[in-house]
Amino acid sequence: MRNFPLVLAACMAATPALADTFQEVTVTAGKTLFEAECRRCHAVDASDPSYGPPLENVLYRAAGSYEGYDYSIALEASGIVWTPAALRAWMEDNDGFMPGTKMRHVGIEDRTVQDFILAYLGSISPQDNKAIEGE
């Protein structure tokens, strides 16, 4: 028991490193899933041509607002802001979430896959995006 304070201090010192490692792994997994699920239509930035609008800085951006992309009237007029919850609903059932959209149905229903993709999208957005939990 004499070493308990030392062990406790070591555990507390290691916690940020574990959190960083977990976040890095989550973002890396999200990038891989983004490449598999989203990349055939969406690039990360405008320098890489894609069918859909680029998704860099998508978190907290107004839906239908990326300049130069021809959105559906429904999406442009929606007033939606791409919060993590809105992006999750979109990934799960974009046709149900926004009838009249031009995007084909995606149907990413696995919340873990959604979490990983959201972590990746957060990593390529300039805001201080926290871990997405419970949304």
Regions found by a protein language model. Give the residues of each.
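Residues at helix-coil transition
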Residues: 13, 35, 43, 60, ...
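Sec-dependent signal peptide recognition
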Residues: 1-9
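Electrostatic cytochrome c docking/interface patches
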Residues: 17-35, 44, 132
